[in-house]
Amino acid sequence: SANNTSNQQTTSSEKTKQTIASKSLESKPQATTEASKNDKNSIPVSYTIKNFEIIGQLPELPTGCEITALTMVLNYYGLNPDKLELATEYLPKTEYSTYYKDGKLIGPDSDNYFLGDPKSVYGYICGTGAIITAANSFISDKNAKYIAKDLSGCDFSELYKYVSQDKPIIVW
């Protein structure tokens, strides 16, 4: 699509396949701020990514904040998913049930699966692995040149730097 084409242009020094990260989405370089022109490691005190559309999760996804956030970021890159499509078709889900074994509480893998259903008030949570899987599956189906990656544990200054470079991140 026309939206996709402009987002996939890269300089010769960039990799063919770009990186999209749950907690950071990367694409072509954007205009720099005054601070970053002078020092690539400088982070502005305040920065707003322009043309970033906010999408509400309610009423359709009462417990689907993570997948709604991913929808907003993918929209920013021109991939235009529907939040319900991402929640239904791409987000890995499992039942939320626990039991005790040898005195330990055992439950499902909340990092790689959404526990329950994000369309239900009884849905619970998912971790980065589930969002990365949903993002990469959707991106692959669209034949887009992005990859989701996990930046968990990185320094906050690195996250701020992504934002100051017009690269939205997802944090929860």
PLM regions: where:
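Active-site-adjacent structural segments surrounding the nucleophilic cysteine of cysteine proteases
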Residues: S1-T128
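Generic surface-pattern signal
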Residues: L91-E95, S140, S164
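Short secondary-structure junctions and interdomain/linker hinges
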Residues: S97, K142, I169-I170
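Short helix-loop-beta junction
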Residues: A134-K142
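Catalytic cysteine-centered active-site loop
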Residues: D141-G153
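Active-site-adjacent substructure of cysteine-protease-like catalytic cores
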Residues: L151-W172
